[in-house]
């Protein structure tokens, strides 16, 4: 949300899951996300999850796609890389620092023996790592945000035929 406040733009939360994930999505709306999209299927594997998110993003392009570390692939980080490949976008994984300057992103990540600083043009997919948001910057929704979140859109999309067939296998 700090990135949104610093550079403008819109934040949309996208997840693949059933109705049980909606309270977490509403919390993201309460702390400042503009919209949320839930793709209505149980995420059974990384490929079908990445396919669904990519299909949505093909119809609704984004300048910056930030994927969290916690995922159904036991934190393997496969989903953001697959999304980047499916959308033919650059990808940087394990990012713990991000700065947007114009149409470029400056990202940093810890590697064996030090820190790596990279630059990439937007649009871009990054996989987040601890440190991307400082603990002191974490937000707790206030009552006003919670009330506003009730009126913000939470769109429910049905999965594509391809992912439905893959999940059935």
For each feature predicted by the language model, list its residue ranges.
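N-terminal glycine-rich FAD/FM-binding segment characteristic of electron-transfer flavoproteins
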Residues: 1-169
């Amino acid at each position: 949300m700090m990135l949104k406040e610093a550079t403008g733009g819109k934040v949309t939360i996208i997840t693949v899951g059933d109705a049980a994930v909606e309270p977490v999505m509403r919390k993201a709306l309460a702390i400042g996300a503009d919209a949320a999209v839930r793709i209505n299927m149980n995420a059974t594997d990384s490929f079908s999850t990445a396919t669904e998110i990519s299909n949505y993003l093909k119809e609704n392009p984004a300048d910056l796609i930030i994927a969290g570390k916690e995922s159904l692939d036991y934190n393997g980080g496969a989903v953001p890389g697959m999304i980047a490949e499916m959308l033919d976008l650059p990808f940087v994984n394990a990012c713990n620092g991000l700065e947007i300057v114009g149409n470029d992103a400056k990202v940093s990540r810890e590697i064996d023996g030090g820190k790596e600083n990279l630059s990439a043009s937007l649009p871009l997919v990054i996989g987040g790592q601890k440190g991307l948001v400082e603990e002191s910057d974490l937000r707790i929704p206030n009552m006003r945000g919670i009330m506003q979140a009730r009126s913000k859109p939470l769109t429910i999309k049905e999965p594509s035929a391809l992912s439905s067939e893959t999940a059935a296998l």
